[in-house]
Amino acid sequence: MAKYIFVTGGVASSVGKGITVASIGRLLKARGVRVSVQKLDPYINVDPGTMSPYQHGEVFVTEDGAETDLDLGHYERFIDVNLTRLSNVTTGQIYSAVIQKERRGDYLGGTIQVIPHITNEIKSRIAAVARQTGADVVIVEIGGTVGDIEGLPFLEAIRQMRKDVGRDNVLYIHVTLLPHIGATGEVKTKPTQHSVMELRRVGITADVIVCRSDYPITDEIRDKIALFADVDVEAVVPLHTVDSIYEVPLVLEEAGLGAYLTQRLGLSASRPDLDDWRDLVARIKAPKRKLAIALVGKYVELHDAYISVVEALRHAGLHQGVDVDIRWISSEQIEEEGCEPLLHDVYGIVVPGGFGDRGIEGKIAAAEYARVNNVPYLGLCLGMQVATISFARHIMGPESRANSTEFDLHTPHPVIDFMPDQLDITDKGGTMRLGGYPCKLTPGTRAYAAYGVDVVVERHRHRFEFNNKYRRLFESAGMIVSGQSPDGRLVEIIELRNHPWYVGTQFHPEFQSRPDRPHPLFRDFVAAAAKTFREGDQRPLPLEQNGAVTEHEPHSR
């Protein structure tokens, strides 16, 4: 029988539950324990696919096409496992399922209530993870903060789980914040005491308290928390703020959490092997030269909107021995000020995914700037599409008004257009091309050199695609289709022939990058940027003109 670790949060949101859960998964995996992870989100949306990035951050897409919480990205990167739609459950999903069953008559005329119908549905989703993955331990994070009204059904469900599967098979971890009072220099425990009491009111007694703090906590503070929370001192685990999230598993291991969980759950575990992880952290902390990379987007005020892109860049930088210095550039600011003041000193440009026409001309300008000035460029989803639009306007002239039908339904040159199977779809949620699809690579291209295989599977999230009516024109002018669907109908990767490194992907490679195994395209993109950086950018830079190549003065960065 699988065992379950339930992780709740107290005092404040964003205390680091997701990273804590991912780190616990890493500690157990290092002991040979089979682990799976699940996130329970109390919001009423069915999934985050239609939510504003400003409210939710990134939408992480799983291999099987689920639009999920960004914490699943942390789980995958730390534990190195591909999760499925089972790993993210929302209140919207639970109520939708229960109402559908009621409409079918599954409840035989009974009165549908939160207990037992909603809680039973939640418990069935939790059990499904263990059943379908064969995990020894399922770690379940409950989103939000203890005391939130929308989280009560989830807390009741995990309370019942201890009775359903046996007390020895369930463990509760409470992640809480210890605020620091600057005026007195004290770390305060009172909010944690109250948070533990709030958890007890719903019938859950925490077995472990993980104490988040910006400062190291003393043994005296641990003793005090242990007394009021009624746990072993060993179960009060300090977790102070660190420079890199990848240090967290080592901090928790040093605090004895891995050994404590193994003992409390009676797991058959081997000696922990964290040597590779320690080496990873040592390389992260080693001094490195900074490499400026611009990330041009419309949600740059909230870095979590692009968290997988950020992590993929860091993974690639670590592999290349450089510290990627991300310059957050608003595409709307480019529209106002132009590219030169904002991009003149960067060595690579990334344009990530997005939707809507706000700031779109700034993204197109960034793609054009990278092409003209031979700055290494990586376009992701929309970033590939704006590169296509930029190239179309270059070879056909700005008066062509080449565009995507997403931004101009009446453009005379729709070089990016609706996918045929999207034309009759009116609903927004869960209706895009989602999840992993195969991509056949073209030998002799940068994409093929990066991957080193003929066919790859990458994750998608889009409604629009390259318009194949323009494919022959583009290829004759110097844009190569270096990846396509196996049937040849969908362009997946484009790149420029006469450029140091210019690649756009219709998919999202950032979702499959790992700290110890950077994604091949990010790896080679950062390598190209680092090469420019190390050479001092003194190369002559060719400027394409309708397929021809001319020389102009080196661009100064």
Swiss-Prot record:
One of its GO terms (molecular function) is glutaminase activity. Mg(2+) binds at residues 71, 141. It is an enzyme of class 6 (ligase). Residues 292-535 form the Glutamine amidotransferase type-1 domain. GO terms for biological process: 'de novo' CTP biosynthetic process; pyrimidine nucleobase biosynthetic process. It holds the Pfam family CTP_synth_N. The keyword Kinase does not apply. Pathway: Pyrimidine metabolism; CTP biosynthesis via de novo pathway; CTP from UDP: step 2/2. The active site is at 381 (nucleophile), 508, 510. UTP binds at residues 13, 188-193, 224. GO terms for cellular component: cytosol. It catalyses: UTP + L-glutamine + ATP + H2O = CTP + L-glutamate + ADP + phosphate + 2 H(+); L-glutamine + H2O = L-glutamate + NH4(+); UTP + NH4(+) + ATP = CTP + ADP + phosphate + 2 H(+). SUPFAM superfamilies: Class I glutamine amidotransferase-like, P-loop containing nucleoside triphosphate hydrolases. Homotetramer. Catalyzes the ATP-dependent amination of UTP to CTP with either L-glutamine or ammonia as the source of nitrogen. Regulates intracellular CTP levels through interactions with the four ribonucleotide triphosphates. PANTHER family: CTP SYNTHASE, CTP SYNTHASE-RELATED. NCBIfam families: PRK05380.1, PyrG. This is CTP synthase. It comes from Roseiflexus sp. (strain RS-1).
